[in-house]
Amino acid sequence: MNSYNKQIGNIGEAVAENYLIQNGYIILDRNFSCRVGEIDIIGKDGDIISFLEVKSRYGNLYGSPGESVNFAKQYKIYKTAQLYILKKKLNRFYFRFDVIEIIFNNYNDDYSIRLIKDAFQL
């Protein structure tokens, strides 16, 4: 990943985290990684543990950001989530996989954000 894309990703994750907090989430972890993969944000939404993939981009020219969360990426998130659940002893909770799409406007600091709850299941 080039540094420009990484910068957009970091800004997107910060925007997503603020959005989640404003909407009542408790942030449990950020950028949890293991040998299998990485999860951008792990939050608690009521009594549900939410594993969130944040996808950010400028404009919508190449489709919605969430479209890039293909089956291979979903599987890595799922396997990483399993390890997180075991490590943190969270097996008593329900959990789901969400995607947050952030599209930045090319002309100013404005952006649109969309939270897709239960974006995928495995």
Curated annotation (Swiss-Prot):
Gene3D superfamilies: 3.40.1350.10. NCBIfam families: PRK12497.1-3, YraN family protein. It holds the Pfam family UPF0102. InterPro entries: Restrct_endonuc-II-like, tRNA_endonuc-like_dom_sf, UPF0102_YraN-like. One of its GO terms (molecular function) is nucleic acid binding. HAMAP family: UPF0102 (MF_00048). The lineage of its organism: Bacteria, Bacillati, Bacillota, Clostridia, Eubacteriales. It comes from the Bacteria. CDD domains: PoNe_Nuclease. PANTHER family: UPF0102 PROTEIN YRAN. It comes from Clostridium tetani (strain Massachusetts / E88). This is UPF0102 protein CTC_01256. Belongs to the UPF0102 family. SUPFAM superfamilies: Restriction endonuclease-like. Disulfide bonds: none annotated.
